[in-house]
Amino acid sequence: MNARLPLLAVLALLARAARPPGQYAQRVVVKDGAHIHVIPLDRLDYAQAQDDYVALRTEGKTLLKSQTLGGLEASLDPSLFVRVHRSYIVRLDRIRALEPYGKNDHVAILADGTRVPVSREGYVRLRELLE
């Protein structure tokens, strides 16, 4: 195992390995004041870490959920969602293109035109999954 992986990433990997196949979340519930939003995961474009919260982007709206990105990642089906950066998880079928950005960096262009940064490790992972 890579010694550079932070503890939360290792715990997320262990949680995924322990989860039986087909036992991934189908939706995310977000409390927004007095409102409760139920987001089916087939409508989730991406998630972005924001301290101890995660910003969920769906259908042109962004909702904040009190959860870490690692916690969310552990509940998602890895065949549908991929962590492309320490701060981003993206739904694979929303990615339309990968473009170079600067000397050694890349960005993922999503179906709605959003540009999401992709780390070097995320780029390698994406290339494997998209081929």
Predicted regions and their residues:
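Active-site-proximal cofactor/substrate-binding loop regions of enzyme domains
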Residues: 2
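Short, basic/aromatic-enriched C-terminal tail that caps enzymatic domains
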Residues: 119-130
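Conserved binding/recognition cores within well-folded domains
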Residues: 7-117
